[in-house]
Amino acid sequence: MIECSWLVISAGVDSSDLAKRGESLIRQSSNRYLTTVRIAFRAKQRRFDDFDGLLEESSVKPVQRAIVELSDEQDQPDLLPG
């Protein structure tokens, strides 16, 4: 699934897949507000990461990347470092 998410990120985001991932994150959380804050914080980190990377143009917005990453982490927690 990780390889699939990198394909999604590199080729652009399928809106229906992104919606399903977002709904899954919200549905499986105990606090919708905190989940929204996590997505926003991750998106902000990615935006600054992109900025530090010499402003490479990306077709995927930071919020979209954040949803894909957090969804993958939720679905496959054994792949997280540590």
UniProtKB/Swiss-Prot annotation:
Disulfide bonds: none annotated. One of its GO terms (cellular component) is DNA-directed RNA polymerase complex. InterPro entries: DNA-dir_RNA_pol_omega, Pol_omega/Rpo6/RPB6. Keywords: DNA-directed RNA polymerase, Nucleotidyltransferase, Transcription, Transferase. Its EC number is 2.7.7.6. One of its GO terms (biological process) is DNA-templated transcription. GO terms for molecular function: DNA binding; DNA-directed RNA polymerase activity. In cyanobacteria the RNAP catalytic core is composed of 2 alpha, 1 beta, 1 beta', 1 gamma and 1 omega subunit. When a sigma factor is associated with the core the holoenzyme is formed, which can initiate transcription. Belongs to the RNA polymerase subunit omega family. This is DNA-directed RNA polymerase subunit omega. It comes from Synechococcus sp. (strain CC9902). The lineage of its organism: Bacteria, Bacillati, Cyanobacteriota, Cyanophyceae, Synechococcales.
